[in-house]
Design a protein with these regions (language model features):
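Hinge/cleft segment of the Venus flytrap/periplasmic-binding protein
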Residues: 17, 156, 171-172, 268-341
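Primarily the dimerization/phosphotransfer
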Residues: 359-400, 408, 412, 418, ...
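Hydrophobic alpha-helical segments within soluble ligand-binding/sensing domains
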Residues: 69, 124-149, 192-194, 218, ...
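Hydrophobic heptad positions in the DHp
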Residues: 417-420, 424-425
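Heptad-repeat alpha-helical coiled-coil signal-transmission segments
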Residues: 325, 329-332, 336, 346, ...
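Flexible loop/hinge segments that line or gate small-molecule binding clefts
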Residues: 91-130, 141, 148, 154, ...
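Hydrophobic alpha-helical
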Residues: 83-102, 168, 182, 186-246, ...
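An alpha-beta-alpha
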Residues: 27, 31, 45, 133-178, ...
Length: 436
């Protein structure tokens, strides 16, 4: 019985503990800043965990601070994350801590931006050179090969700012009639974009186009032109986020001339991370495709995004319900497991008590039989001598030659023998009644 109970308990334990054999991974995500575009990426990464439930994400944002990002990555290293996804703030300043993580055996995915080191596991992001080249070619076509342009770049020293400028300038080499009369840095920020555009209006006019390296700076530049009541300057940006007040809406409404979809694709980032962690094949350099957004396609793209957002909301709601049901199911499994354990323990106790009672009863029966046998033997041992005494005494009493004194003594002996015989018989009868 103990063997069977042990087998059942072991089976229950294995069933309860073996709910998920997949290894759980912890992935650290180090963002260089906080903005709508990075929020979109983070949300896509979280959505991807709905499909890949063996990954847990930890997020950190450095707010464009190199020192803070270094500290955050060091903390991820200290915590022993399984993989790092990093968007480095600048090319040079973050390289050493990324190298440190890589040297410790932590896989590193560079997303969106690069460093000056080759110590990374994989890169995924748009081709910023191609993005800049596309925007340069678009502006040149709109200007028909002649005009004055100003460029508002992102953070100086960051790989997107460097590569977008390089692609932009290379595209314009084919159009000698176009001159870039000003290049300013606005650190990807809307307010700085407005401030730098103020300076361009003050010092570098006239200009026909402004190439801002993201939509926030482009909208900031637009606000500067509106503030100065200047018309005729066309502004393009990059990102084309389909959010209220974002680049795509601004293009649809005619406020920006064009933008370029700078893809996030958090789903592909997560898939790349899991391919690395689970030792599946992957490409080291992965370039995401974007697309030019003009008034011709902006409205259609916004409609598509609206429908996608609805589906995403439904999926998020469904995932929340599934999580609730799974939590209830897991609780029920725990209750069933505990109930099964208690039931088996009760059965085991009952079997133990029953066996104890049976053994005790057998011992008592053996003890009773031993006592009965003892008293039977004793009675036999007593009755035999008493009988041997009683018969001769009875015979002698009947002898006529006895004097009265002798007869009286023999009668006393006869009575005592009878009393002893009666006592032995009563003891035996009492034991029989006691034993049932």
């Amino acid at each position: 019985m103990k063997k069977y109970i042990f087998i059942i308990l072991s089976t229950l334990l294995i069933t309860a503990c073996n709910t998920n054999n997949n290894r759980q991974y912890v992935i650290g995500v180090s963002q260089c800043s906080e903005d709508i575009w990075r929020d979109k990426l983070n949300n896509e990464l979280v959505m991807s965990t709905y499909q890949h439930d063996n990954a847990t994400l930890k997020f950190a944002s450095a707010n464009d601070n190199d020192k803070l990002q270094t500290e955050q990555i060091n903390q991820f290293i200290k915590e022993g994350v399984d993989l790092l996804i990093v968007s480095p703030n600048q090319i040079h300043t973050i390289s050493s801590v990324i190298d440190k993580a890589y040297d410790k055996g932590i896989p590193v995915i560079l997303f969106d931006r690069k460093t000056d080191s080759k110590k990374y596991t994989a890169f995924i992001g748009a081709d910023n050179y191609e993005v800049g080249h596309e925007m340069g070619h678009f502006i040149a076509q709109q200007l028909k090969g002649e005009g004055r342009i100003a460029e508002i770049s992102g953070l100086k020293g960051s790989s997107p700012a460097i590569e977008r400028n390089r692609g932009f300038m290379d595209a314009l080499k084919a159009f000698p009639g176009i001159k870039v009369v000003s290049r300013r840095y606005a650190d990807w920020l809307k307010q700085k974009g407005e401030d730098e555009m103020d300076s361009i209006i003050t010092r570098d006019m006239p200009i026909s186009y402004v190439f801002a390296q993201n939509d926030r700076m482009a909208i900031g530049a637009l606000q500067a032109t509106e503030k100065h009541k200047i018309k005729g300057i066309k502004i393009v940006g990059i990102d084309a986020l389909p959010v209220p007040g974002g680049g795509m809406e601004s293009v649809r409404d005619g406020r920006l001339e064009a933008s370029y979809i700078y893809p996030t694709r958090g789903d592909l980032v997560m898939q790349l991370a899991l391919n690395i962690l689970e030792k599946r094949p992957y490409k080291r350099d992965n370039y995401l495709k974007g697309a030019l957004v003009t008034r011709d396609n902006a409205n259609v793209l916004l409609m598509q995004n609206e429908e996608m957002n609805k589906q995403t909301a439904r999926l998020t709601n469904l995932h929340g319900k599934v999580d609730t049901y799974l939590a209830q199911y897991n609780h029920q499994k725990v209750y069933i497991f505990l109930f099964s354990i208690i039931t088996l323990l009760l059965i085991g106790i009952m079997v133990y008590v029953y066996r104890t009672i049976v053994i005790r009863r057998r011992i008592e029966e053996e003890a009773t039989n031993a006592k009965l046998q003892f008293f039977t033997n004793i009675s036999h041992e007593l009755r035999t001598p008493l009988t041997l005494i009683a018969d001769p005494v009875e015979y002698i009493i009947n002898d006529k030659n006895l004097n009265p004194q002798q007869r009286n003594m023999l009668q006393i002996v006869e009575r005592n023998v009878a009393v002893l015989s009666q006592l032995v018989s009563e003891i035996l009868d009492f034991r029989k009644v006691q034993n049932g």
